[in-house]
Amino acid sequence: MLERIGISLEDGLLEQFDKLIAEKGYVNRSEAIRDLIRDALVQRAFTESSGREERVAVVTLVYDHDSSSLAQKLAHIQHENHRAVVSALHVHMDPHNCLEVLVLRGRGKDVVAMGESLVATKGVKYGKLVPATAGHDLG
């Protein structure tokens, strides 16, 4: 069942939102707002969980592979937590930069700790931990 609701937004914010949803290919505002709500609920489930529930997340890292100590540090963190690493993808972006995408699975607090450790490693140019969900509780 769907419920209709109303929201109030400043003109400038609505204009930016409409531009964003058009760029992303949403057919209407409702779909975009539902996705924003789902994302917020997934984030909350990850941060508010007791840490015992099994969670899945994706970690994205970009770094300069010429920094051998950095590559070794990242590999060391992964090997220390090898049971949590479900999959790893390594892409050579250009002659110097590498993209690494890791799928992690385990207790929520362990997944978050490992992901944050990788992202915070000195020398990582870009890093992001993205929680994933099967969506059972999202309606």
Swiss-Prot record:
CC cofactor: Ni(2+)
Binding sites annotated in the UniProt record for Ni(2+): H79, H90, H92, C98
Keyword Transcription regulation: yes
InterPro entries (alphabetical): Acetolactate_synth/TF_NikR_C, ACT-like_dom_sf, Arc_rbn_hlx_hlx, CopG, CopG/NikR_regulator, Ni_resp_reg_NikR, Ribbon_hlx_hlx, TF_NikR_Ni-bd_C
A Pfam family matched in the record: RHH_1
Keywords in alphabetical order: DNA-binding, Metal-binding, Nickel, Transcription, Transcription regulation
Cofactor, free-text remark: Binds 1 nickel ion per subunit.
Biological processes, Gene Ontology terms: response to nickel cation
A molecular function GO annotation: nickel cation binding
Record has Transcription regulation as a keyword: yes
Signal peptide segment: none
NCBIfam families cross-referenced by the UniProt entry: PRK00630.1 (NF001884), PRK01002.1 (NF002169), PRK02967.1 (NF002815), PRK04460.1 (NF003381)
Alphabetical list of PANTHER family matching this protein: NICKEL-RESPONSIVE REGULATOR (PTHR34719:SF2)
Function: Transcriptional regulator.
Family: Belongs to the transcriptional regulatory CopG/NikR family.
Protein name: Putative nickel-responsive regulator
Lineage: Bacteria, Pseudomonadati, Myxococcota, Myxococcia, Myxococcales
